[in-house]
């Protein structure tokens, strides 16, 4: 049990960081397509730590703080996903299709908690972003890659050993 949790935490951190980078890249692309500055998402990430001042403060500070905050949260969400998945059946853990569904739902749950619960109290400027777009981005560009990376990792672990060759 402890070994399974330890492995799930490790897989979760790795998958969370990779999915977090993918999500950040898509947030940047989305910002540009909507006519906003490319690094506006990084400023938003930084505002979790620095408050509203990150939106107009020095860009260098926002880049460093925003990147660290975003990756730290991505790793934490990855750990939560990994620990949740540790309780699922091997069939579900290794199925790309099932994991895709679970991952998208997880991404939507992350969006809901972050935007509809926490942001309403602590970060009201987050609510100025298009919420449907944010929900889709969290599901498709964080939750989905997180789940598929996790499933690929589980498939490697649970793959049958190759048959021994006879001479």
Regions found by a protein language model. Give the residues of each.
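Membrane-interface interhelical connector segments
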Residues: 34-59
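Non-cytosolic membrane-interface motifs at loop->transmembrane helix junctions
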Residues: 124-137
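Short, charged juxtamembrane terminal tails flanking transmembrane helices
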Residues: 1-6, 154-167
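N-terminal signal-anchor transmembrane alpha helix
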Residues: 2-35
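Transmembrane alpha-helical segments of integral membrane proteins
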Residues: 83, 111-124
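Hydrophobic cores of alpha-helical transmembrane segments in multi-pass inner/ER membrane proteins
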Residues: 76-79, 138-151
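Internal alpha-helical transmembrane segments of multi-pass membrane proteins
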Residues: 10-12, 86-109
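Hydrophobic alpha-helical transmembrane segments
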Residues: 63-85
């Amino acid at each position: 049990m402890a070994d399974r949790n330890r492995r799930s935490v490790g897989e979760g951190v790795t998958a969370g960081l990779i999915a977090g980078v993918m999500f950040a890249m898509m947030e940047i692309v989305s910002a540009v397509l909507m006519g906003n500055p490319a690094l506006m998402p990084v400023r938003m990430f930084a505002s979790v730590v620095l408050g509203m001042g990150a939106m107009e403060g020095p860009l260098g500070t926002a880049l460093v703080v925003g990147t660290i905050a975003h990756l730290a949260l991505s790793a934490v969400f990855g750990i939560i996903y990994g620990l949740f998945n540790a309780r699922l059946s091997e069939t579900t853990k290794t199925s790309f299709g099932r994991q895709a569904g679970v991952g998208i739902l997880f991404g939507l749950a992350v969006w809901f908690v972050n935007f509809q619960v926490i942001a309403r109290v602590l970060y009201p400027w987050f609510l100025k972003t298009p919420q449907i777009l944010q929900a889709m981005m969290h599901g498709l560009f964080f939750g989905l890659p997180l789940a598929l990376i996790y499933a690929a990792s589980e498939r490697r672990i649970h793959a049958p050993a190759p048959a021994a060759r006879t001479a």
